[in-house]
Each structure stands twice: as C-alpha cells, then as structure tokens.
Amino acid sequence: VLLIPEIDMPGHSAAFVQAMGHDMQSEEGMAILKQLLDEICELFAELPYLHIGTDEVQFTNPRFVPEMVAYIRAKGKRVISWNPGWIYQPGEIDMTQLWSYRGKAQPGIPAIDCRFHYINHFDTFADLIGLYTSRIYDQPQGSPDLAGAILAVWHDRLTLPETDLIRTNNLYPNLLALAERTWLGGGFQYFDQFGTCLPLDPMDPAHQAFVDFERRMLYRKAHDLPDYPFAYVRQTDVRWRITDAFPNEGDLARVFPPETALQPSYTYQGKTYGSREAIGAGIYLRHVWGTTVPGFYAEPQENHTAYAWTWIYSPQAQEVGAWIEFQNYSRSEKDLPPRQ
C-alpha cells in the first residue's frame, strides 16, 4: 500500500485563511505554507509522493504553483497535481490526476485516471458493472504516460459509525473491480461508451467477463472477507423487464396501461410502447451523470413514467429483507436538492 498525502493548494483552503489570516497565494500565506510543508515532508519522510491539488480555484499569483512544486521537489519528493488545475509542461510536474471529464492526459506527464471513479456517487450494483468493464482512460494497457487509476470516496459528511462509509459506498467490491482492471489491463469500452448496463447476450465477452468476476469476487467475500462490511450479493441472475417511458406531462399520479396488465408492449393514445429486458440489481434509467454515461434509455426525457418488473422465486414461504436504493444526490454533497 502506497500512501499519498495531499494538501490541496491554493484552493479548498478556506480553513487555512480562517486559521492563519492570510490567503495561500499571498506572500505571507506562502511562507506559512512552506513551514507546513516542512512538517509534512518530515512526517512522511519515507513516502515518495506529495499531492498538491491545484483544482477548482482562481489563480491570482503566477509564482505560487511553480514555487511550491520546486520547494517540495527540493526535499526529494515527487509532486502530483489535479488535472484540470494548474497547466504544466513536461518536466514541470511528476504526475497528474485526472479528476473530471475535462481532464486530459498530456504526453510526457504520467497521468492517473480518476474521472469516473467517485464511488460516493455510485449505485451499489450498476456502476460496479461500468467500473469493471471500462478500460483505464480508454486504453488497453498502461504506458509511460498512463500510470494507472485511483478510486475515490469523498466523505465530506460526518458519518457514524465510520464503517458505514465503507458499507454505503460499497468500497470492497469497487476496490476489487478496479484492482483487477488496473492489474490486468484490458476492458471493453470506456465508461462514457459502455455505460452501466450488462449486455443481455450470455455469449457477449463483456457479459461473460463480469459473470466470472462476480463469481470470484463473491468467493473472496465468503472466504477472505467474511467479517467485513461487503455490501454485495449476486446480481447477474436478476432480470427485469422495463417499458418505454410514457409521457406524464408532469402529473406523477397519471395511470398508464402497465398498471392493469404486464405485457411485452402496449398501445396508448395511438402509439405503441414496447418493453426490453435488463440484467442487474440496479438499473439506471438515466445515469447520475446524465447522458455522459449511457443508461437504460438512450435519450431520457423529463416528465415521463417508466414501469419495471421482475420475478422473485422462493422455495418456501418466508420473510426476507428487501434492498431498495434510489438516487440520493451523492452520499458526499449537501447541495443539489431536487427542483421544486
């Protein structure tokens, strides 16, 4: 395990301003920050990397980032920076971490792919399919310009007990999926092309690969991690039928034909609405990242109603638990309330 400490600078630093009384990019702030870097580099003397952030900020001092990179490098450490962030030329930074869809790897600068890897935004089941099947930065293998990938979980909210962060964000299954993909390379298409829907054809290579991964992962859950909060059960045997979306014109109480009979297709107001199969315990009708990541509907529209059904077999009469999850605007952020 390689620990990479990060001090985000000069952005995400309101606490620094409040505590020190100076903006990080000011002369006084830079002097204080260098003292903090002295302590950090001493504390983590055996670690080769230090991450300096540089994301989501307005730069007011053009000296700031180059001077901080040079200061840290002079202490024998290699420096990582977010991309998008400060713009570097080869040789000016040791590695970049691509944090958003706008982040692009640059020739001559090793990059870490993190663009679709924020598991606090993930559905427990659907995004695991996308994570496992996706190529790293849409490349089949690593290279001098592609160092690998990182999985992120932003735990901005105070969560007690802390183990709930691992459980609700499905850490271990996602960790195993990305670990195998980065170790072996390969994959099928990138997240923004493949999406999160498992192919229906059992002979499809992506279908077969995920079924095999799931089998091996559940073995590890049972034999290596039986006492860990491993929030996953088999989903490749779960089949749904989902209708085309009916226009409700904003009336969520409007009733459509599937409420009276379950059929392969329906005629409503002179138009035919079909239905299709889907596999998995979590199905995105529209992905949390919109049409950037494909979901069940190729062109999802507002003010529509969809119907989905499946069958559950039990060999005997019994009471069992139900695992029900809906989009929750990320388990990290406190903003983004639904429109009224």
Report the location of each language-model feature.
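C-terminal active-site-proximal or functional interface alpha/beta core segments in diverse enzymes
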Residues: 56-125
